[in-house]
Amino acid sequence: MGDSKTPLPPGAERYESFSFNVRLLTVMGVVGMVLLAVLGRTFYLQILQSSNFEERARLQQQRTVRLEPRRGKILDRNGRILAVSVPVGSLYTNPSQLKQRKRVAQRLAPILKIRSRKLVAHLKSKAPFLWIKRQLTPQEVQQIQKLEIDGLKFLPEFRRDYPAGELAGALLGFTGVDSQGLGGLEYGYNRWLHGEEVAYVVEKEGMFRTRPEIRDERWEFNQHTLHLTLDSTLQHIAESALRKGVKRVQGKSGVAIVLHAPTGQILAMANYPDFDPNRYRRYDAAQQVNAAITHGYEPGSTFKVITVASALNEGIITPTQEFFCEEGRFQVADRVIRDSRPHGNLEVGQVIQKSSNICAAKIGMEMKPAQFHDYITKFGFGAKTRAGLPGEAAGQVLPPEKWTRVDHATVTFGQGILASPLQVVAAINAIANEGEWRPPYVVEYAEDESGGRHTEFFNESGEVLARFGPKAPRRIIDTAIARILTRFMVSVTERGGTAAKVAIPGYKIAGKTGTSQKYDPSLGRYSNSKFWASFVGFAPAFQPVFTALVVVEEPPRPNHYGSKAAAPIFREIMQRALLLMDVAPETPPTVVVTRPATPEMTVDPATFEAIGMQDLD
């Protein structure tokens, strides 16, 4: 048979060759398609999606920490720094980097003044970025650096510093650890003091090993420095006198305010007990507030100036008209009104000088409730002064349609009305300004980072967001009437007045004492043992430079009178203020009195305008 091969059918070789070529082309096609897909994917990833992957890689390698910027300064009228942001270091870590956390905590604890056990628990966090303590002192930073502990890092931040400590603390307010204003001017003007936040980038390598930090350079953008009307020296004088005076009479608290009489600028605003914003956590909330604007009190006899001014301006009474003071006891409906001392007949000026409740009630009741209420509101009571101080209270004035006869009588001597100390001093400042009420204010202007001065800020719609500096005054009473009231108030500080000891050699002081009982909600009546003692006035009386008010809360008997608790503080502040500003001694005008023919005679205000400042004693 042999081994001869079976011959292939015709065309078989050509078929086998074709089949091989098809398979080869198929494989090559598949390989080509795969290569094309790979190349396409590579092009897509490396070219079209490169920025996206770079961003992902960056996010994996970096952590962005949002830090607060440097706040604008707060300066007094002479450019002295009251608040400033200083650079500090803040300690952070990635806990996974730390070895021997317990040992690290033990070494850090005494420096940071944190219990070691608490620090160990804190370092157990699994967060890749962990604050250990922020806003360290330079000494703390230096001590920690000397420890040379791997994994501990610092980021630069700013801490708010108040170089003068307690000076104007309640007025300035304070900021939190994130540089946000939490009280006082810091809170009220946070929008302008606070710049834009800073993006601070921390790069990571491997297991969050940090590379050198990358700093964003927007540290001082868009914040403003506030320039105040406050005078640091006068503020210190007011705080010192208030602290000493309240302690002397063993009072609970006190407030002192000094205005620049012609403009309404707030030169000093003191609170006792005082408050250091550098250590705000050590104080309770009651000590952090500015009682000069937030606390309402019954102004007592200081309000008699408003009563007499209103009646005189209406022409209902005359300056020398006499009123019978009922020998110290006057029945109004179911209420008995008393004077501290019995009086017979008193002229209007003597009602102020001797501070008669009974005659003040009789004068006030000569006016209709709506008529009197209108003057009360014109003098600024029942509404915020809009001095630019956050947290200001509007006070409380009962609507005239709700007045009873007792309400009508008692409001004349400052009972049944709530007012802030700032409202009272602003009202009396209207007398100093010959009948014009001038809005008090504390911010003169805001300065931007390029040195531009701003007295107004607007939103995108053109609405005013803030307005600084002086505002337009409004006339309340005629000039002649205001001058008469000034003379009446001068008699208070002269022989025979309730505050003769306030007199300062070389100057005429226009003033008024105030003593009011505190309402006790638990008793449902006025307390017989708790009082507000106050004194308000301006000097020099006939060319006023300063208007000031002192209020002392709860001075115990027998020092509960305004003449004993508040007047001595006022005298010390005013005397030192006159010396500080080098105010020349005043020579009072020579005046002549022409008495009316009858007590009922009314005097045209134009008459007093013509005769100027008259001595009506």
Residue spans of the language-model regions?
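Beta-lactam-recognizing serine transpeptidase/beta-lactamase-like catalytic domain environment
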Residues: 2-14, 83, 204-217, 230, ...
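Periplasmic/cell-envelope proteins involved in peptidoglycan metabolism and beta-lactam response
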Residues: 1-280, 291, 296, 368-382, ...
